[in-house]
């Protein structure tokens, strides 16, 4: 794991007392409180991101109305969240359109926002997907048009592309940065070996290496973020931006009694999630949630807040992306920040005992 408190930690922490916008109030989650918001460096870059970000997968341009999307973004921004993540493939580009319209309407300073998008699946034509120089440049241009922005802060390669030479991808990412279309680039769903290859190519040809990997991370999926990415951080400075802290809602407990209507697992095209929940492994996970519920009650928080705080306790995580379909959900999730200081080493040990899936690095085996 990462050292507890070094300036080299990928998530160098700072607290900002947010002013009037940082006032959080919900009768359900307690009295009005001035929110202390964490900011962390994205990997070893100088880019400061809120430790919670708002993702737009499934929700923006799809599951929720544009009015609800605006409400969620406003709530996030007012509570110090500066990171908003999308992708060219989300709702076939509509998520980017909705996000861009809201930014324009609200009149927020562009310099106060960190906007990230992902490139890989752009359209039906053979040349409209992948990580070729052609698609990276054309895809990002199209994304910027939908977002109505001059640049994104981070452009991610949304998955590895075995059909494109790594040098071509790294050169194209360097080009879009040099052209002012993006500030940084990162990877998503890449293996450690692929990220390392991109870094080596960048160093060999004096190009720009990636600063961050977007990875799935929650109580039931730990290996990559807890073992592989820390090694990459120490070697080449790549940080972790994580998604699905509630395992697509499984950890929220809402699937305890089956698949409720209007939930993500009930949506068309999400049969894989339904199958996952109803599988033998899914049932085992549901059983463990009852034990986590008892811990959450002891800490005076909800199960989703405990799960998100658990992700945040990992200093290797620069930011955790949240998905929410209504204001109450988002407010509850933001409240995880107040649970973070309550996660003592004994509580973490207790959670590890219930999960029984703590991954071990090579270093642990040697010791």
Swiss-Prot record:
Q: What one GO molecular function would you report for this record?
A: voltage-gated potassium channel activity
Extract one GO cellular component term from the record: cytoskeleton
Q: Report the EC code(s) recorded for this entry.
A: 1.1.1.-
Q: Which GO terms describe its biological process?
A: regulation of action potential; regulation of potassium ion transmembrane transport
InterPro entries reported for this sequence: K_chnl_volt-dep_bsu_KCNAB, K_chnl_volt-dep_bsu_KCNAB-rel, K_chnl_volt-dep_bsu_KCNAB2, NADP_OxRdtase_dom, NADP_OxRdtase_dom_sf
Main localization is cytoplasm
Name the Pfam families for this protein.
Answer: Aldo_ket_red (PF00248)
Q: Membrane topology type, per the record? A: Peripheral membrane protein
Provide the alphabetized UniProt keywords.
Cell membrane, Cell projection, Cytoplasm, Cytoskeleton, Ion transport, Membrane, NADP, Oxidoreductase, Potassium, Potassium transport, Synapse, Synaptosome, Transport
Specify the domain of life of the species encoding this protein. Answer: Eukaryota
Residue sites binding NADP(+) per the record = 56-57, 63, 85, 158, 188-189, 214, 243-248, 254, 262, 264, 323, 325, 329, 332-333
This chain's function reads: Regulatory subunit of the voltage-gated potassium (Kv) Shaker channels composed of pore-forming and potassium-conducting alpha subunits and of regulatory beta subunits. The beta-2/KCNAB2 cytoplasmic subunit may promote potassium channel closure via a mechanism that does not involve physical obstruction of the channel pore. Enhances current amplitude of Kv1.1/KCNA1 and Kv2.2/KCNA2 channels. May display nicotinamide adenine dinucleotide phosphate (NADPH)-dependent aldoketoreductase activity by catalyzing the NADPH-dependent reduction of a wide range of aldehyde and ketone substrates.
Q: What is known of its domains?
A: In contrast to KCNAB1, the shorter N-terminal domain of KCNAB2 cannot mediate closure of delayed rectifier potassium channels by physically obstructing the pore.
- What family, per the record? Belongs to the shaker potassium channel beta subunit family.
Can you name this protein?
Voltage-gated potassium channel subunit beta-2
**What organism is the protein native to?**
Xenopus laevis
């Amino acid at each position: 794991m990462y050292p507890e408190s070094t300036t080299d930690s990928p998530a160098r922490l700072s607290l900002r007392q947010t002013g009037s916008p940082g006032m959080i109030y919900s009768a359900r989650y307690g009295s009005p409180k001035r929110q202390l918001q964490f900011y962390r460096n994205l990997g070893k870059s100088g880019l400061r991101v809120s430790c919670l970000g708002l993702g737009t997968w499934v929700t923006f341009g799809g599951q929720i109305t544009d009015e609800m999307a605006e409400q969620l973004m406003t709530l996030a921004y007012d509570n110090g969240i500066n990171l908003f993540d999308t992708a060219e493939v989300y709702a076939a580009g509509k998520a980017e359109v909705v996000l861009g319209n809201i930014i324009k309407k609200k009149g927020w300073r562009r310099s106060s926002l960190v906007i990230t998008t992902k490139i890989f699946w752009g359209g039906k034509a053979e040349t409209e997907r992948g990580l070729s120089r052609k698609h990276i440049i054309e895809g990002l241009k199209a994304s910027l048009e939908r977002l109505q922005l001059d640049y994104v802060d981070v452009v991610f390669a949304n998955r590895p592309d075995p059909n494109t030479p790594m040098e071509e991808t790294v050169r194209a990412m360097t080009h879009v940065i040099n052209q002012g279309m993006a500030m940084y680039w990162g990877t998503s769903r890449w293996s450690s070996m692929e990220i390392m290859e991109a870094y080596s190519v960048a160093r060999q040809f004096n190009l720009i290496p990636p600063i961050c990997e977007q990875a799935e991370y929650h109580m039931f999926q730990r290996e990559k973020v807890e073992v592989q990415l820390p090694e990459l951080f120490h070697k080449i400075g790549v940080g972790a931006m994580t998604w699905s802290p509630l395992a697509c809602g499984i950890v929220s407990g809402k699937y305890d009694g089956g698949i409720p209507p209007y939930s993500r697992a009930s949506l068309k095209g999400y049969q894989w999630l339904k199958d996952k929940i109803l599988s033998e492994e899914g049932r085992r996970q549901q059983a463990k949630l009852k034990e986590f519920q008892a811990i959450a009650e002891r800490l005076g928080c909800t199960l989703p807040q405990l799960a998100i705080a658990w992700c945040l306790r990992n200093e290797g995580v620069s930011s955790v992306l949240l998905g929410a379909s209504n204001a109450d959900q988002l407010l509850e999730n933001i409240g995880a920040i107040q649970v973070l200081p309550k996660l003592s080493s004994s509580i973490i040990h207790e959670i590890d005992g219930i999960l029984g899936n703590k991954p071990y690095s090579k270093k642990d085996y040697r010791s």
